[in-house]
């Protein structure tokens, strides 16, 4: 229905893709399932697939992400960002998990 309302379907259509993301968040059974739902809907699959994975990972927690999603990385992350020297995916995940407590101490 959202594509009918806005009359366009394609890459980088924020209303449509936000609607698809809401659809994913509503029906995902776990992180991997949600990534598959999001990417299967088409459009900007890499960006919104990553967004869905991030949001669902925060919601479900690490226990709901199957090893098959992490194994290809060999605990190594590469980034084109200047001055970003973190290479361990697991260390980066731990640091990101600590952020809410640093921003709002009562969440720790």
Question: Model segments located where?
Answer:
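Acidic, carboxylate-rich catalytic segments that either coordinate divalent cations
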Residues: 1-11, 59-108
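Generic structural signal for well-ordered, non-membrane alpha-helical segments
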Residues: 14, 18, 31, 45-48, ...
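Short glycine/serine- and small hydrophobic-enriched flexible loop segments
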Residues: 23-27, 55-60, 98
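Acidic/polar loop patches that form or flank catalytic/metal-binding clefts of enzymes
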Residues: 32-35, 49, 65-67
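Accessory "access/gating" subregions that flank catalytic or transport cores
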Residues: 1-42
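Conserved phosphate/anionic-ligand binding catalytic regions in large, soluble enzymes, centered on
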Residues: 42-60
């Amino acid at each position: 229905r959202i594509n009918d309302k806005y009359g366009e379907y394609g890459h980088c259509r924020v209303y449509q893709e936000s609607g698809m993301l809401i659809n994913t968040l509503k029906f995902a059974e776990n992180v991997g399932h949600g990534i598959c739902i999001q990417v299967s809907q088409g459009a900007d699959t890499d960006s919104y697939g990553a967004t869905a994975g991030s949001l669902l990972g925060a919601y479900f927690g690490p226990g709901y992400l199957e090893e098959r999603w992490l194994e290809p990385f060999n605990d190594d992350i590469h980034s084109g960002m200047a001055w970003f020297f973190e290479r361990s995916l697991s260390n980066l995940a731990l640091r990101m998990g600590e952020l809410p407590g640093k921003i709002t101490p009562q969440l720790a």
